[in-house]
Amino acid sequence: MKTVSFLEFCKEIEKRVIGQEEVKRVCYNIYHYLELIAKGSRKSLPFILAAPSGCGKSETYRAVKDYFNKELHFLSCIYVDASELTEAGYKGNNPETVVNGLLERPNSNGIGIVFLDEMDKKMIPSYNSMGQNVNAAVQHGLLTIIEGREVTATNHSEVRVNTNNTLFIAMGAFDFVRASKEEEKFISLGETKGKRDHFDGITREEMLEAGAVNELVGRFQSIINYHRLTEESVRKIVDLNVKELSEEFDINIFVRDDVYSAMYAVSNGKFGCRLLKSILRERVQAMDMKRKLCGKSAPPVAFILNGDGDCCLEYEDVC
């Protein structure tokens, strides 16, 4: 990491992951891992990224992967859907398959970042016909891999990967915990009874209560939580998406002020910014299709979006 400063790395990721202050901690943990690898240390520091749906979890992975593909192309950034993992000996992907992607880089010796997405899905008990908790078995299978050991790659029987050199980042929305937060009533001194926030941070204790294996949760050094987006952050996200749509459709798009208020409410719903992006795209596509069906050959001067999610066209007067 001699050629890349932490500040530079962090700023680049924050251009993509907007409005999440805790993304700095994600960047720091990754940067510190690479510093340790550069020193020859085998001390990996796995962590959990808990983020409500649509708040930047997947974008964090994509931003980190894109950055290292450009700046440190020798470093593998692997995506694994943990919800597809099965207990060793059963049909499907057993826990050891999580290292297979590291073999795409020759002589990696296990150096790389493995993003275990949907890890929260494996922390909920799931029982087979014999009453065995199969998800607990998967968690136990991941234990020593995350802690660090040599693993024989399932698709290359002659190759062994040392996961002491690997950084594991478990990711999840933890919707099952958030649902219980919303249902739970609590009373504090001087406060009235009310519901807890869907966007409150997830704790180790809540993971354990939901069914996570204590030993596995303990292997992760820290939990990083993403939170509710601010109005300023939503404005930036709307502007960024509008810019991308303008370039894609080769038009100018103007956004009225009430759009930002409407999109703020959308962004902090249970679907997050993912729904915001879908709404903007659907409205622009619908109006572009209408324009083309009407036989308008000249591009419109502007699509104007309003807070109801509708838009209208304004054409340049060429007469």
Residue ranges of predicted features:
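Walker A/P-loop
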Residues: 35, 39-80, 104
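Conserved nucleotide-binding/hydrolysis micro-motifs of P-loop NTPases
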Residues: 53-55, 67, 83-87, 119-122, ...
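Short glycine-rich substrate-engagement loop in P-loop NTPases that contacts/grips substrate
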Residues: 78-109
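Conserved AAA+ ATPase "sensor/coupling" helix adjacent to the nucleotide-binding pocket
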Residues: 30-31, 210, 232, 236-250
